[in-house]
Amino acid sequence: MIGRLRGVVIEKQPPEVLLEVGGLGYEVQMPMSCFYDLPEIGKEVTIHTHFVVREDAQLLYGFNHKQERALFRELIKTNGVGPKLALAILSGMTATQFVLSVEREEISSLIKLPGVGKKTAERLVVEMKDRLKGWVSHDLFSPAEISLPARESVLRAPDSSEEAASALVALGYKPQQASQIVSKIAKEGMSVEDIIRESLRSLV
């Protein structure tokens, strides 16, 4: 089990980051709520990871805090929720926002998340509400998670909008929907992370 990685950020391709650790490169998928807070390329970072082994792949999911990883693990315990959907859910909302939505039974907020229909939203509330009691009130999440700052340089590549749209598709949105929202959001001077952040806000 790989539980934590400490290394240098080599490449960022939302929602995936490539870390160099001891001469090896690790591809780590992260929810966008965590991805936004990564340092710039060339800087060192510590990521808490969840390791998934499948017949056709070995996957690493990364988080800035242990509490976010704990929530991810609670999500994948829920019937019908796999790692990909859990990643999409935590990209559409911060950990704190999700816990509060479940505690308050805000089905209308949950169904706006990629891949979450009414039945799945209801299942999340029924199966997770008791398990998540006290998570926010006991300060298990940092207040900073509610609004994370952008930490990326402005866009320079002409295909940045395409990169942002690809990231949204990877998170579960339909290609046409992703392209349409990105075309409305993207403006000169915005980073890829900024475009994704604003797109997710408008979709949720």
Curated annotation (Swiss-Prot):
GO CC terms, sorted: cytoplasm; Holliday junction helicase complex; Holliday junction resolvase complex
GO biological process, one term: DNA repair
GO function terms (MF aspect): ATP binding; four-way junction DNA binding; four-way junction helicase activity
Residue span of region Flexible linker: 144-155
Family named by the database record: Belongs to the RuvA family.
Subunit structure, as described in the record: Homotetramer. Forms an RuvA(8)-RuvB(12)-Holliday junction (HJ) complex. HJ DNA is sandwiched between 2 RuvA tetramers; dsDNA enters through RuvA and exits via RuvB. An RuvB hexamer assembles on each DNA strand where it exits the tetramer. Each RuvB hexamer is contacted by two RuvA subunits (via domain III) on 2 adjacent RuvB subunits; this complex drives branch migration. In the full resolvosome a probable DNA-RuvA(4)-RuvB(12)-RuvC(2) complex forms which resolves the HJ.
Domain comment in the entry: Has three domains with a flexible linker between the domains II and III and assumes an 'L' shape. Domain III is highly mobile and contacts RuvB.
Protein name per UniProt: Holliday junction branch migration complex subunit RuvA
The species this protein was found in: Aeromonas salmonicida (strain A449)
